[in-house]
Every structure is written in structure tokens, then in C-alpha cells.
A protein has these predicted regions:
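PRY/SPRY (B30.2) beta-sandwich protein-interaction domains
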Residues: 1-169
């Protein structure tokens, strides 16, 4: 199913994970009226606010922003090289490793991982994640944005990294 957003908001999935390796995809179907995505994709804990602010603004979420291609957490950002911007028609890939003491997250757009990294080999992660129970999350700054999330309920557009569960379930 697709979801269209009419106000600034963040949406969290309803299944959380605190251990394991997971992969999911979000396809941005359309952008807001200003022509930019204003979208963020990533993971958040249940403490991350919804409906009032973008996730990534607090320590409870890790979000890749499609407008500027930066990773947000706790109100600050990391700028990967190259930046990973995305817009209408793009598929955002998220791989999360919650198995070891060091929790890791990777992002990719349209089949290309950040900095040409490879989650299956455990190198090149974009961010180290604090321990906790995480939910897949999507947020938007502008009305009129729609997206389609795939948490494993159908085949993925891109290859699931080696050793990762195909989906969030």
C-alpha cells in the first residue's frame, strides 16, 4: 500500500527489533509541492516524536534526508561523500546490523550503497547506532509526498546484502 502525507510528520513501523540484521526499502512515489522530497528514511526508537517534528532531530532516530543527502541524528548531521539525495521514483535501501556491541546502519539509493560500501562485508557503514529497539521510519517536511515501504512483504527491487534478513519481520 502507498501512503500520502498531508502535513509534516514522521511514521514509525509497528514491529521493533533490538538484535539481528535487517534490510528494507522505501520508494518515494511523488514529492511535495515545492519540488523537493523533504523526505527522511531510516530507523527510530519509540521515543522518537511523530507528527510534530522530523525524526533524526533527537537521539531517538537515524534518518537519511533526501533533500540534502545527509544523515541526521540528535539534531546534527553527517555528510557522506558523495551525498545520497533522492527524489520521486528513487528507492532508498536501508541495512541495519543490531547483532554486535557496535550497531551499524547503511543507506543506499537505487542500488548504490553509501561510499560504495558493502553491508554484507560489514564495512563502510554510514553511522554507528546506539543500542535499543528500532522501528523502520519515514518522515516528511512537505505535504503531498507519497511513498511505498517494503518491509519484506514482496520481492525487493535491489539485492538483499549477504547475511541480512530480507525484511524487517
Amino acid at each position: 500500500a502507498s501512503i500520502t502525507i498531508s502535513n509534516i510528520s514522521a511514521i514509525r513501523g509497528d514491529i521493533g527489533n533490538s538484535s539481528g540484521k535487517y534490510y528494507f526499502e522505501v520508494t518515494l512515489e511523488s514529492v511535495g509541492g515545492n519540488g523537493t522530497s523533504g523526505a527522511r528514511v531510516g530507523i527510530a526508537t519509540s521515543a522518537s516524536p511523530t507528527y510534530t517534528t522530523q525524526f533524526g532531530a533527537t537521539s531517538a532516530g537515524y534518518a537519511l534526508d533526501g533533500g540534502d543527502g545527509k544523515l541526521y541524528n540528535n539534531g546534527s548531521f553527517t555528510a557522506p561523500s558523495p551525498v545520497l539525495t533522492f527524489g520521486a521514483g528513487d528507492t532508498i535501501m536501508v541495512a541495519v546490523d543490531l547483532t554486535s556491541a557496535t550497531k551499524l546502519i547503511w543507506f543506499g539509493v537505487n542500488g548504490v550503497w553509501n561510499n560504495s560500501s558493502n553491508p554484507g562485508s560489514g564495512i563502510g557503514q554510514l553511522k554507528t547506532v546506539t543500542a535499543g529497539t528500532y522501528y523502520p521510519s519515514v518522515g516528511f517536511w512537505y505535504p503531498g509526498v507519497s511513498f511505498r515501504a517494503n518491509f519484506g512483504q514482496r520481492p525487493f527491487v535491489y539485492q538483499v546484502p549477504s547475511g541480512f534478513t530480507a525484511g524487517w519481520y
